[in-house]
């Protein structure tokens, strides 16, 4: 076969003309330091703040400090096999997490990866973890109630959909129990719940997940967990990942309840990162922007306008106090950001008052306008009565003689405290709360011994379930009380045929 030189040169020319170079230009740098969840890299001159970076071994990092000679990076995940001298490249993207219906019922880490052993999550939708909060004109005022199922909260410090209500108290005072009960009570309320566990033991998170599964609440709940054994960057990111998942539902017209358990541990993780990145420390060694850390998170909870879907995110952030000190730095920061706080008292908890809500220190700044009419009527004076009872109780310790009016106030106060107690994981529908609080405020419990209040409550509910279902139905549908004559007659009838005469 003869080789034609002209043909060969024509073929080569054709190949050269048709050649399409396929190469990807990315800016790369070199890792100059790595340790304790952070790295420094030289050569990433155009990196953006918050940009996602990829290490040589496939791990991800996030640019935090942009300095003149290098970039401070937080490492998202395991950093043990990253070495000095490794290459690192920019992605040009900011961090996003998977979102959507596929996450419901799953337990995920802050990067959206499943940790429950139930396989991959089938969703192709993502949202950035950091997005601007809705503006003033994009919001609506809080007008719908969020029923927690706890008498002490729904009556004294009511929460509305779109509100941020801080739950603050020492360790072991029942903070998590309140949040879990609130999640359980959303069954059938068309709410999606997100429980963000920050810096907790994995065994504790497992217990909470099993509780949710046992009561059928995992069918509408997403659990985001960054356990105590994970690196600080994941603890810092967990709440932002949780609220990004919530925003997907909110902007599609749904209502979400998100629980941050707890933000004290997130602040500690952020302090650790900031000190490792050599940022100047401020009060209690926290960096100067620790207020912004929480404000930009909690401002993303809102009830948005109808143009944006009319959905809402209700936030229950937790703060753990030391020896009941609510004037600590992080505590006062979050109190000033939120729309009210529920203060759980160590003394009340140890005295058997559970939930241990201190009515004097707790307040809801917007939830009152979201209460249903029936609850407003029966719970109107409850807070003041309870506060004056606590005051009187302190005076009675001096042993002075009491007049009849004071004695009556004390008796009513003791019964109020008893009625507001509630066993764990037994949230009450609002119509039952209204009935027992009506019985309390209208004097039906004044002659019942304090030790029998719980039994009275159970038997009253059983009697109403059997004979007075119409009253429950009226409260449910009209959101208002039936006429006083009807309620008085029904409760009197129960008292007459019971052993509480």
From Swiss-Prot:
One Gene Ontology cellular component annotation held by this UniProt entry: plasma membrane
Enzyme Commission number(s) from the entry: 7.1.2.2
Site feature (Required for activity) residues: 362
Membrane topology: Peripheral membrane protein
Cell membrane as UniProt keyword: yes
Domain of life: Bacteria
InterPro entries in UniProt: ATP_synth_asu-like_sf, ATP_synth_asu_C, ATP_synth_asu_C_sf, ATP_synth_F1_a_nt-bd_dom, ATP_synth_F1_asu, ATPase_F1/V1/A1_a/bsu_N, ATPase_F1/V1/A1_a/bsu_N_sf, ATPase_F1/V1/A1_a/bsu_nucl-bd
GO molecular function: ADP binding; ATP binding; proton-transporting ATP synthase activity, rotational mechanism
Top EC class of this enzyme: translocase
Pfam family, one: ATP-synt_ab_N
Keyword annotations: ATP synthesis, ATP-binding, Cell membrane, CF(1), Hydrogen ion transport, Ion transport, Membrane, Nucleotide-binding, Translocase, Transport
Binding annotation for ATP: 169-176
SUPFAM superfamilies recorded: C-terminal domain of alpha and beta subunits of F1 ATP synthase, N-terminal domain of alpha and beta subunits of F1 ATP synthase, P-loop containing nucleoside triphosphate hydrolases
Family per similarity comment: Belongs to the ATPase alpha/beta chains family.
Role according to the record: Produces ATP from ADP in the presence of a proton gradient across the membrane. The alpha chain is a regulatory subunit.
Subunit (UniProt): F-type ATPases have 2 components, CF(1) - the catalytic core - and CF(0) - the membrane proton channel. CF(1) has five subunits: alpha(3), beta(3), gamma(1), delta(1), epsilon(1). CF(0) has three main subunits: a(1), b(2) and c(9-12). The alpha and beta chains form an alternating ring which encloses part of the gamma chain. CF(1) is attached to CF(0) by a central stalk formed by the gamma and epsilon chains, while a peripheral stalk is formed by the delta and b chains.
This protein's name: ATP synthase subunit alpha
Organism for this UniProt entry: Streptococcus gordonii (strain Challis / ATCC 35105 / BCRC 15272 / CH1 / DL1 / V288)
């Amino acid at each position: 076969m003869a080789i034609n030189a002209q043909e060969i040169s024509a073929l080569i020319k054709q190949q050269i003309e048709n050649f399409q170079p396929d190469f990807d230009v990315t800016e790369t740098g070199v890792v100059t330091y790595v340790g304790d969840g952070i790295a420094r890299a030289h050569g990433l001159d155009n990196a953006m703040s918050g940009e996602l970076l990829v290490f040589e071994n496939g791990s991800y990092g996030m640019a935090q400090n942009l300095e003149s000679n290098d970039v401070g990076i937080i490492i998202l995940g395991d950093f043990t096999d990253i070495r000095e001298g490794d290459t690192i490249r920019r992605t040009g993207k900011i961090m996003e997490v998977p979102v959507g219906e596929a996450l419901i019922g799953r337990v995920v880490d802050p990067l959206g990866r499943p940790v429950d052993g139930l396989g991959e999550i089938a969703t192709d939708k993502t949202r950035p973890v950091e997005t601007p909060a809705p503006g003033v004109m994009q919001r609506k005022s809080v007008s719908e109630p969020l029923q927690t199922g706890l008498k002490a909260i729904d009556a004294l410090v009511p929460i509305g959909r779109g509100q941020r209500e801080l739950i603050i108290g020492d360790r072991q005072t029942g903070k998590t129990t309140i949040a879990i009960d609130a999640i359980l009570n959303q069954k059938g309320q068309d709410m999606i719940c997100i429980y963000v566990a920050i810096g907790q033991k994995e065994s504790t998170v497992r217990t909470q997940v099993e509780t949710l599964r046992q009561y059928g609440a995992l069918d509408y709940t997403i659990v985001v967990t960054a356990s105590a054994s994970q690196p600080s960057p994941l603890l810092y990111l967990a709440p932002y990942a949780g609220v990004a998942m919530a925003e997907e539902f909110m902007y599609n017209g749904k209502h979400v309840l998100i629980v941050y358990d707890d933000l004290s541990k997130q602040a500690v993780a952020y302090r650790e990162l900031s000190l490792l990145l050599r940022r100047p420390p401020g009060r209690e060694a926290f960096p100067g922007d620790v207020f912004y850390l929480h404000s930009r998170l909690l401002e993303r909870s809102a009830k948005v306008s109808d143009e944006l879907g009319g959905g809402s995110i209700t936030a229950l952030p937790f703060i753990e106090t030391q020896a009941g000190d609510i004037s600590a730095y992080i505590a006062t920061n979050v109190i000033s950001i939120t729309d009210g706080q529920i203060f759980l008292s160590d003394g009340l908890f140890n005295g058997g008052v559970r939930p241990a809500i201190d009515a004097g220190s707790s307040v809801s700044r917007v939830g009152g306008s979201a209460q249903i009419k029936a609850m407003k009527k029966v719970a109107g004076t409850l807070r003041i009565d309870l506060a004056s009872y606590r005051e009187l109780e302190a005076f009675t310790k001096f042993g002075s003689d009491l007049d009849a009016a004071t004695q009556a106030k004390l008796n009513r106060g003791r019964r109020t405290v008893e009625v507001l107690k509630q066993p764990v994981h037994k949230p009450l529908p609002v119509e039952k709360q209204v009935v027992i609080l009506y019985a309390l405020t209208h004097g039906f419990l004044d002659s019942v011994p304090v030790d029998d209040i719980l039994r009275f409550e159970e038997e009253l509910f059983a009697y109403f379930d059997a004979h007075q279902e119409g009253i429950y139905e009226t409260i449910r549908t009209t959101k208002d009380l039936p006429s006083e004559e009807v309620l008085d007659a029904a409760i009197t009838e129960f008292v007459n045929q019971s052993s509480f005469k």
